[in-house]
């Protein structure tokens, strides 16, 4: 992130809260800035969404009675911008003392505002309390690599793609780890995630993959940028025929962000994990 971009970001700063609906809180961050460092242009080698879950969504009905809901917001990775997370929190909080005629109206306003700022069509789903039972805790289906013994001591925590390698045998498998930690590029605060990697191709060395994910522990980057870096490093180093990288980050400020990147047709599930 360049300094001039960080200058306008509300994250880590004292920012006033609006008592009523205020879309001016929304702050865009251009995707192209981080993608330049990965050598990515407009012709992306992946597709997929960023799935945001909003757990603190509330507004007033036409008589002033509070309503609560869960929100699911899906941004395409082809959007011009991501939305800075604190700005989205402030935006959603501005609904708290604003009256709306219906849940459908709230959904439409959020969809219109986020689509405008992101620069692409955004999907919004709102779950009312009667639908909360639809949200259940799940787990990845693949093999967890967290208990593998690493042969060498870890002394540095910076992304190192050279840890990634493959063997001669072909396989199709899903691997996951709960050990990803990255850091906010603005505040330096840690972000935690489970990373699910599904691929077909030459078998990825699992110890090397685990060491690679651990190497992000002091890396600074937004969630979306970190996942795209992981995706591109695996794609470039291991050359799978098919690859999907899906990260489920823990929530902050009532929001969690879950980037999904794939080389093939999108078929994703909003897979809520225990730490979320």
UniProtKB/Swiss-Prot annotation:
The active site is at residues 184, 191. GO terms for molecular function: preQ1 synthase activity. It comes from the Bacteria. InterPro entries: GTP-CH-I_C/QueF (IPR043133), NADPH_dep_7-cyano-7-deazaG_red (IPR050084), QueF (IPR029500), QueF_N (IPR029139), QueF_type2 (IPR016428). Its main location: cytoplasm. Substrate binds at residues 83-85, 223-224. It is found in: Cytoplasm. NADPH binds at residues 85-86, 252-253. Pfam families: QueF, QueF_N. Its EC number is 1.7.1.13. The keyword Oxidoreductase applies. GO terms for biological process: queuosine biosynthetic process. It catalyses: 7-aminomethyl-7-carbaguanine + 2 NADP(+) = 7-cyano-7-deazaguanine + 2 NADPH + 3 H(+). Keywords: Cytoplasm, NADP, Oxidoreductase, Queuosine biosynthesis. One of its GO terms (cellular component) is cytoplasm. Pathway: tRNA modification; tRNA-queuosine biosynthesis. Catalyzes the NADPH-dependent reduction of 7-cyano-7-deazaguanine (preQ0) to 7-aminomethyl-7-deazaguanine (preQ1). Homodimer. Belongs to the GTP cyclohydrolase I family. QueF type 2 subfamily. PANTHER family: NADPH-DEPENDENT 7-CYANO-7-DEAZAGUANINE REDUCTASE. This is NADPH-dependent 7-cyano-7-deazaguanine reductase. It comes from Desulfotalea psychrophila (strain LSv54 / DSM 12343).
């Amino acid at each position: 992130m360049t300094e001039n971009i960080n200058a306008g970001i509300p994250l880590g700063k004292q920012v006033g809260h609006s008592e009523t609906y205020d879309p001016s809180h929304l702050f865009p961050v251009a995707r192209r800035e981080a993608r330049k460092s990965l050598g990515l242009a407009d012709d992306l080698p992946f597709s997929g969404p960023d799935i945001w879950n909003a757990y603190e969504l509330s507004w007033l009905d036409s008589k002033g009675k509070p309503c609560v809901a869960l929100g699911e917001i899906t941004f395409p990775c082809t959007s011009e911008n991501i939305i800075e997370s604190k700005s989205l929190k402030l935006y959603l909080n501005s609904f708290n003392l604003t009256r709306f005629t219906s849940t459908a109206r709230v959904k439409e306003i959020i969809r219109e505002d986020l689509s405008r700022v992101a620069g692409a069509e955004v999907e919004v789903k709102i779950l009312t309390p009667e639908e909360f039972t639809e949200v259940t805790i799940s787990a990845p289906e693949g093999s967890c690599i967290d208990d593998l013994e690493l042969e060498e001591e870890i002394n540095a925590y910076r992304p190192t793609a050279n840890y990634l390698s493959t063997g001669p045998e072909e396989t199709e498998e899903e691997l996951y780890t709960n050990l990803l930690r990255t850091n906010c590029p603005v505040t330096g605060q840690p972000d935690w995630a489970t990373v699910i990697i599904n691929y077909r191709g030459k078998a990825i060395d699992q110890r090397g993959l685990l060491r690679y994910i651990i190497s992000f522990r002091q890396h600074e980057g937004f969630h979306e940028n970190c996942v795209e870096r992981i995706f591109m490093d695996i794609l470039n180093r291991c050359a799978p025929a098919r690859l999907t990288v899906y990260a489920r980050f823990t929530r902050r400020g009532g929001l969690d962000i879950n980037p999904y990147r794939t080389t093939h047709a999108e078929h994703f599930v909003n897979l809520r994990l225990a730490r979320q």
